[in-house]
């Protein structure tokens, strides 16, 4: 979203700059694509292996169309009560241009049709946003045994897609995700009000250009081409995922009851050894004697918090630069 977008800007604007390896933007983009495609493939392979192994412990990820009649009835009710009310279909036609889809949101493009009086099909295109307010992984109630069965939210939405388009049939569909340019373009030298410039740049970033398209499942070429044209991308910008998009949903699944024997033991971070015998001593005093390297998460982030707190009341501290930090429990 940042570095690749910056390289794309160089290519589009005809800027020729070389990095330390004497590679220009085009060469870097090609190398990045080859590396990321390989990583994506490895990720899918490892994930699919893990999901297959989970079946040995009674956890099955399946498709709605493979469920038994009773489970389908439950899923239909779940869809009508929880999913249908929060999904708003978006038409795409001459009067409704391709909608702006927010960065990293998952959507399904659907090709629907209506039978005309002469027997021919009238085709239309629509977008079904996959709502982020709902869990991506849905558990199907147990059938009285030890099996735990799950389906994916996007699979449920596409399975019941005809419910959103009464009077139309579903020809085909494709689930996809767009990555957008999230780089901040700020001219600190020219900006008269840096805060306002940052705020305006953040607003522009929400509508950044598309830089990558991820697709999964049975990809229909005509739908893929339609999306590529609509967001001004090319085939080289497409990443085909062997599985489902956005693996972050499995982080929550890791906390599912019944997986205790498969989890790693909780890890407690430690206080750096250099600070163990210096309780109460100023960190500035300690680092004045020797450098202190804190490796999080193996060592406690509390040290960094103490450093910031002490710097805040130190009259000799001029400024503090913070890049980013992960959420803490």
Regions found by a protein language model. Give the residues of each.
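Single conserved hydrophobic/aromatic residue that forms the stacking wall/gate
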Residues: 322, 327-329
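N-terminal non-catalytic structural scaffold regions of very large proteins
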Residues: 1-319
């Amino acid at each position: 979203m940042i570095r690749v977008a910056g390289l794309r800007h160089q290519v589009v604007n005809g800027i020729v700059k070389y990095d330390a390896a004497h590679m220009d933007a085009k060469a870097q983009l090609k190398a990045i694509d080859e590396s990321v495609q390989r990583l994506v493939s490895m990720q899918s392979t490892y994930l699919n292996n893990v999901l297959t192994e989970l079946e040995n412990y009674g956890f099955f990820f399946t498709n709605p169309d493979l469920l038994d009649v009773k489970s389908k009835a439950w899923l239909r009710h779940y869809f009508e009560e929880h999913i249908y009310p929060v999904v708003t279909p978006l038409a795409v036609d001459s009067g409704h241009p391709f909608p702006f889809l927010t960065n990293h949101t998952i959507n399904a493009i659907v090709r629907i049709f209506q039978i005309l009086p002469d027997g021919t099909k009238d085709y239309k295109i629509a977008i079904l946003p996959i709502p982020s307010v709902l869990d991506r992984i849905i558990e199907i109630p147990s059938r009285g045994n030890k099996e735990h069965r799950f389906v994916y939210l996007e699979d449920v939405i596409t399975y019941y897609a005809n419910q959103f388009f009464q009077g139309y049939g579903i020809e085909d569909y494709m689930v996809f995700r767009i990555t957008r340019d999230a780089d901040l373009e700020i001219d600190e030298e020219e900006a008269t009000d840096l805060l306002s410039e940052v705020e305006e740049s953040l607003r522009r970033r929400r509508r950044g250009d598309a830089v990558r398209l991820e697709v999964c499942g049975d990809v229909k070429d005509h739908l893929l081409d339609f999306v590529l044209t609509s967001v001004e991308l090319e085939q080289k910008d497409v990443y085909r995922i062997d599985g489902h998009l956005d693996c972050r949903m499995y982080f929550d699944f890791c906390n599912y009851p019944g997986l205790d024997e498969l989890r790693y033991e909780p890890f407690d971070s430690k206080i750096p050894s250099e600070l163990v015998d210096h309780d109460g001593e100023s960190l500035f005093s300690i680092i004045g004697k020797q450098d202190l390297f804190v490796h999080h998460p193996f060592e406690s982030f509390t040290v960094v918090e103490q450093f910031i707190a002490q710097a805040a009341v130190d009259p000799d501290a001029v400024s503090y630069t913070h890049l980013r930090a992960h959420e803490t429990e």
